[in-house]
């Protein structure tokens, strides 16, 4: 059954206003293995500063492939709720639940948007709210961030990753991403190659100059150590990912502190290209 919401989503993809993230995640599932899943668990443990999530509830906002919902479930989360606005991403998350979730796992999967304040409010409060690289693709990043903060319980944690603001460079990337989504399908791969290969060639050349040419090769072969991800699928996601918004770390801090959040951990991309990661704790009411 096609709902009005799914027709709107399909229309946005068709018109070039939105990247089909779920299709890229579907391809990622073909390379997903136990090693990548283990790396996803490691990344959650490291950023949250916990060995497990036993007894905690976990909300995955924009679940994408479903990998981190799965990781949370495997770390012992008492309850996992995943939602995504992209129907293909919902399908990916359901597929991972089917493949890997043990019997009795409390893991709900739904189709919804982080911009739907009523939906987010209806979910109640969670111990961990996770949204990695999602809110800046909603089309209204600050509204989406405001919505998801309401799902964090007192003393709970908010773990987000937001694209770093590079000023004029970010504007150029926004134009490239918009172009990707307006191109016919056969022209998209050539654009990815044209945009990213010069960067890759420069990285390879630096490895050669340092006398360590295999470092570049390992950057590809060992990439699964980066949150269990795939470098190629991340490149496609990067070039195509649209809508596209950015923020400086200070803007995120200034937005969340008045809403009762304290920064617990931050991992930036050094002012360059990529996402800044934040873990906040919600202060209990006085």
Residue map of PLM features:
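Conserved alpha-helix/loop element of class I SAM-dependent methyltransferases that forms part
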Residues: 35-54
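Class I SAM-dependent methyltransferase SAM/SAH-binding core
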Residues: 71-116
């Amino acid at each position: 059954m096609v709902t009005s919401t799914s027709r709107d989503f399909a229309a946005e993809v068709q018109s070039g206003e939105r990247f089909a993230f779920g299709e890229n995640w579907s391809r990622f599932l073909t390379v997903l293995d136990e090693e990548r899943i283990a790396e996803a668990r490691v990344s959650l443990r490291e950023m949250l500063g916990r060995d497990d999530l036993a007894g905690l509830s976990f909300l995955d906002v924009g679940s994408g492939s479903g990998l981190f919902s799965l990781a949370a479930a495997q770390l012992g989360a008492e309850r996992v709720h995943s939602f995504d606005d992209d129907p293909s991403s919902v399908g990916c998350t359901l597929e991972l639940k089917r493949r890997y979730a043990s019997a009795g796992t409390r893991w709900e999967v739904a189709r919804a948007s982080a911009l739907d304040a009523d939906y987010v409010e209806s979910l109640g409060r969670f111990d961990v709210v996770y949204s990695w690289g999602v809110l800046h693709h909603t089309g209204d990043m600050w509204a989406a961030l405001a919505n998801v903060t309401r799902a964090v319980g007192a003393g709970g944690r908010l773990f987000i990753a937001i694209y770093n603001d590079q000023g004029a460079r970010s504007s150029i990337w926004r134009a490239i991403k918009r172009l990707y989504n307006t191109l016919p399908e056969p022209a998209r791969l050539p654009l990815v190659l044209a945009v990213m290969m010069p960067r890759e060639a420069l990285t390879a050349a630096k490895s050669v100059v340092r006398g360590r040419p295999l470092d570049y090769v390992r950057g590809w072969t060992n990439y699964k150590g980066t949150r269990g991800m795939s470098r190629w699928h991340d490149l496609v996601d990067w070039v195509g990912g649209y809508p596209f918004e950015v923020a400086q770390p200070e803007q995120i801090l200034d937005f969340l502190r008045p809403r009762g959040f304290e920064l617990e951990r931050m991992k930036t991309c050094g002012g360059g290209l990529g996402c800044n990661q934040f873990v906040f704790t919600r202060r209990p009411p006085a």
